[in-house]
Amino acid sequence: MAKFDLTAKNCQYLDRHLTFPLLEFLLQKKVFDQTSLLKFILETVSKTNMVDYKHDIRERLAMDKVHPDELAQGRANVLATLKELQAEVAPLMKCMEELKNPDSTKDSKSVIHALQQTLDYDIILSAQKLAKYLYECGNYNDSLSYLYVCMLVMEPNDKNYLGVLWGKLAVEILTLNWQTALEDLTRLRDFIENYNFSPIQVLQQRAWLIHWSVLVFFNHGKGRDLIIDMFLYKPQYLNAIQTMCPHILRYLATAVIINRGRRNALKDLIKVIQQESYTYRDPITEFLEHLYVNFDFEGARKKLHECQTVIVNDFFIIGCLTEFVENARLMIFETFCRIHQCITIGMLADKLNMKPDEAECWIVNLIRNARLDAKIDSKLGHVVMGTQPLSPYQQLVEKIDSLSVRSEALTLLVERKHKAKTQEAGEGHWKYY
């Protein structure tokens, strides 16, 4: 379903190393021409130091084989540069080894402070350069070690500190360390919000962070709540989505659909989807519009079928397919039941894209698991709904969420009016291109 593929849009906001898993995923799905895609990967990997990966892509393209001597020379050049950079940072690493020594009587904070005061700044820059070089070689774990050192000895007001934060987040994502990635994501977000960027720069930084965070949120246990809190209820990030990347609404909508505990976010989400429908729409956003705006159950049923195809071909959310279908069916069912108190199982089966016996079994399981206040009349083949008033607690939660959004928007407005004229910031992120 190439029409709804977001890989090209998403890759604009991702580091080239983060794009490789997405591009390899597309190759497996065979959505696009394989040769064209492999050529694009080759063009991208050629900008890195990943000699073996480049050689592998050339072989998959059945291009002229690289001479073994040429391949060996490429590896030798990379290793030679690595040795030079490692020699430059040797004094720094010797000090860091002292910190690791359990017999050392020195306090780690005092050692780090001493390093900041006495180390030649060029050595710290060399450590960052080495971390970046290792990263470009695809040696992410070793890169992480040097990035960690840079974070310890660099002052937050250093012009290169932000680049280190971006690099650390990239490495944690690529090594699938989701808990640490979430911590780095929070640290980076706080830094971006407090740094003296120009308005256009901070908008760009937020757009990059939004895309990187999708990778983290859909792989972390708490991510489904956090993505809603950040994308929908932080006005500055919602504004960035609406301004720079409305296609991110697909992932926000998916998070709300699979998160039964956040149904109170539906009203706000649908409002945003309607506002942005002229710039972006896909089967997932249209499913919600059909169901909650138009009450078009037939349209929602058809869109749910399309949603499954979209999700299966989307690297970010393919792992949510089963949950998505289950919760989407439940949403159709709940909405239909608000309108009709007594429904035939055959009618429900049609709306849910299920066979009658499957639909009856599905409803029985809902009732059994205390997720539904209803009774089944097997003789007549009817489902009779009970009353489902909104609990006082849920009403309170909705009001608090609404007040929280208004308060944050007002705070941002006040800060913007009192903020001094911003200075042009240096390089904004872990620069790859």
From Swiss-Prot:
The keyword Ligase does not apply. Its main location: cytoplasm. Keywords: Cytoplasm, Initiation factor, Protein biosynthesis. It is found in: Cytoplasm. It comes from the Eukaryota. PROSITE patterns: PCI (PS50250). Pfam families: eIF3_N (PF09440), PCI (PF01399). CDD domains: eIF3E (cd21378). GO terms for cellular component: eukaryotic 43S preinitiation complex; eukaryotic 48S preinitiation complex; eukaryotic translation initiation factor 3 complex; eukaryotic translation initiation factor 3 complex, eIF3e; nucleus. InterPro entries: eIF3e (IPR016650), eIF3e_N (IPR019010), PCI_dom (IPR000717), WH_DNA-bd_sf (IPR036390). Residues 217-390 form the PCI domain. GO terms for molecular function: translation initiation factor activity. One of its GO terms (biological process) is translational initiation. Component of the eukaryotic translation initiation factor 3 (eIF-3) complex. Component of the eukaryotic translation initiation factor 3 (eIF-3) complex, which is involved in protein synthesis of a specialized repertoire of mRNAs and, together with other initiation factors, stimulates binding of mRNA and methionyl-tRNAi to the 40S ribosome. The eIF-3 complex specifically targets and initiates translation of a subset of mRNAs involved in cell proliferation. Belongs to the eIF-3 subunit E family. This is Eukaryotic translation initiation factor 3 subunit E. It comes from Anopheles gambiae (African malaria mosquito).
